[in-house]
From Swiss-Prot:
It is found in: Cytoplasm; Nucleus, Nucleoplasm. InterPro entries: TIR_dom, Toll_tir_struct_dom_sf. Changing residue 149 to E: Decreased ability to induce cell death due to impaired homooligomerization. This is Disease resistance protein RBA1.
Length: 363
């Protein structure tokens, strides 16, 4: 079981994996470190239970989900077979350049960890006597690899509070590098996706509306009001207003510049963020309840903000896309049936705003 700190940014935030051993530091140093990471909005993964089992598949998954690992070497670290297996997996990820490890030497010397000497070495060799030769070799290589990296040490007489501040500062510095890289990658994907969606929406009038809204999501990052122009354009030109064919296969649609497998994974997050941004831009609207604009007294100071008709359609359409994204990701039906679900939501939207729909289509 792991505890993951909450999300704080739109761009996916790299997680920090904490590896340690010992009840004596769990309720002291580790708990204070975890509190500090959470205060600074740093996502982290930490095992709640001291008895962690031997599920290496789960172990590898937790490490692979992280971009940074803090290995807290203490005198008892090497007595744990599970901890030693953790750093072996970390070394594999480091070799593949998928993980950055920061060794933290908590009241142990770095050379004792690397050379398996001192109190740390005694624990290691005691464990080695109960283990296989190939396993011992992997542990030794992992210890040397990780302990020789640039790390932080807590020596005698140093304040743990100051030491924790130094650790958090270093983690923030490292994460800033990853976040910058992720933002650049995200921007490149955005440009590629936009080009493909513009061409695809023009070429395939029977595409589900969700494709258009993904396009809107990226435009809305630059200007929230651009969404009105997109809606007006879609209504006037009749894009994606026609029902899909019964045998529509989303998989068969060719959209230049789009990998549909990656697209469906990106869509749910895109729709959620679009919905949140739109709700915030439109005023005092509670996203957790349906918004009823009909017969709303507009002269009351406590009533929701009065919205133009197109914005009402925009708001409802984002709800539609949220439903569509959910079904796309959650159902196990074929993509042809998913297309029918999207059209079902679109038909409900048309009926709710029939006057607006009829007027804009005639333009």
């Amino acid at each position: 079981m792991t505890s993951v700190s909450p999300r704080y940014r739109n761009v996916p935030v790299p997680k920090v994996f904490l590896s340690f051993r010992g009840e004596e530091i769990r309720h002291g140093f580790i708990s204070h470190l975890a509190d500090a990471l959470e205060r600074y909005g740093i996502m982290f993964i930490i095992d709640k239970d001291e008895q962690r089992g031997n599920d290496l598949t789960s172990l590898l998954l937790r490490i692979k989900e992280s971009k940074v690992a803090l290995v807290i070497f203490s005198s008892r670290f090497a007595e744990s077979r599970f901890c030693m297996d953790e750093i072996v997996k970390m070394k594999e990820c480091v070799d593949e350049r998928k993980l950055l490890v920061i060794p933290i030497f908590y009241k142990v010397r770095a050379r004792d960890v690397s050379g398996r000497t001192g109190d740390f070495g005694k624990k290691f060799w005691a464990l080695a006597q109960k283990s296989r030769g190939c396993q011992i070799k992997e542990w030794m290589e992992a210890l040397e690899c990780i302990s020789n990296k640039m790390g932080l040490s807590l020596g005698d007489g140093r304040s743990e509070a100051d030491f924790i501040k130094e650790i958090v500062k270093e983690v923030e510095r490292v994460l800033a590098t990853f976040t910058s890289e992720d933002t650049e990658d995200h921007h490149c994907q955005t440009v590629k996706l936009l080009k493909g969606l513009v061409v695809g929406c023009l070429a395939h009038q029977e595409l589900p509306l969700v494709l258009v809204f993904t396009q809107v999501y990226y435009y809305v990052k630059f200007s929230i009001f651009f969404i009105e122009e997109i809606f007006s354009s879609c209504f006037r030109k009749g894009f994606v207003l026609k029902p899909c064919k019964e045998d529509l296969q989303i998989n068969s649609i060719s959209i230049p510049g789009i990998d549909l497998e990656n697209f469906k994974n990106m869509m749910q997050q895109a729709m959620y963020e679009l919905n949140q941004m739109l709700l915030q831009s439109l005023g005092n609207i509670d996203p957790h309840r349906d918004v009823a604009f009909e017969n709303q007294p507009q002269d009351q100071p406590d009533s929701p903000i009065a919205l133009p008709e197109e914005r009402r359609v925009a708001l409802e359409a984002t709800k539609f896309c949220g439903h569509a994204a959910y079904w796309w990701n959650q159902t196990k039906t074929t993509r042809a049936r998913i297309g029918k679900v999207l059209i079902h939501f679109w038909e409900k939207l048309k009926k709710k705003f029939k006057d607006t729909y009829d007027r804009t289509v005639r333009i």
